Amino acid sequence: MYRRIIMCFRSRATLNSFQRGMCCSTRRYVSSTGSEDDIKNFIIDNTEIVNSQSLTPEISLRLFTPTCRFWTENPEFWPFPDPYWAIYWPGGQALARYLLNNPEVSAGRKVLDLGCGCGASAIAARLSGASCVVANDIDPIAAIATKMNCELNNLAPLPCVTDNMIGSETDGWDLILLGDMFYDEALADGLHQWLQTCTNTHGTQVLIGDPGRAQFEDHNIRRSLHRLAHFQLPDSVKEENYGLTSSAVWRYNCKPDH
């Protein structure tokens, strides 16, 4: 199943809408019927606590590992939407590492982690002294996993919002974090437009983590970015991500960076 998730993530930009639906169409979505305690127990039973072989060994996360059942299990038996939250993606790793290395970036600020996945960037912001952190992911299972990961790191569970916040009002945020969000052209277009509003209208700072996927490198948004940091990925992360060797953090500028 792990390989399927990686390949689905890599290919989504080139799939048509029918094929995208087929990535998940056979799932038995039970997120709305199972209790939160049942879902937590399922996550505990089918993930492993990991705090090594990443760019942020000081953060513990519940993730898929080769010892987990669904690493190799037929994905048709997975009862939820595809578990992107169970993988620590390289863009998110770079973003979390940057925040931990530079705590002044988030200290005392109101932070939104958009598309939070496992919640690592949100956790890094909170550990770095952010006054308020909200995690956002449209997958309600990711929200539960993020709260569990907060507890692993001796933090009170962060507020998690499962609405699609792209296009929403953002005047309350000092800093918006986006890790590995530029995998689909239509999504990237929507993000670009929304981020322009965030920065131009409200002065929100935006940081983006991405390992250099083609969908990101080829998008017009690259002209509006300034690279802040660059990290070599651990060997295990390189292997799991099919040749991606490094990951970077970018600041979104109001005007194109020439």
From Swiss-Prot:
Enzyme class: transferase
Location, primary (coarse class): cytoplasm
InterPro entries given in the database record: Ribosomal_L11_MeTrfase_PrmA (IPR050078), SAM-dependent_MTases_sf (IPR029063)
Catalysed reaction equations from the record: L-lysyl-[protein] + 3 S-adenosyl-L-methionine = N(6),N(6),N(6)-trimethyl-L-lysyl-[protein] + 3 S-adenosyl-L-homocysteine + 3 H(+)
Annotated S-S bridges: none
Coiled coil: none
Single GO biological process annotation from the record: methylation
Protein's recorded name: Electron transfer flavoprotein beta subunit lysine methyltransferase
Organism (species): Danio rerio (Zebrafish)
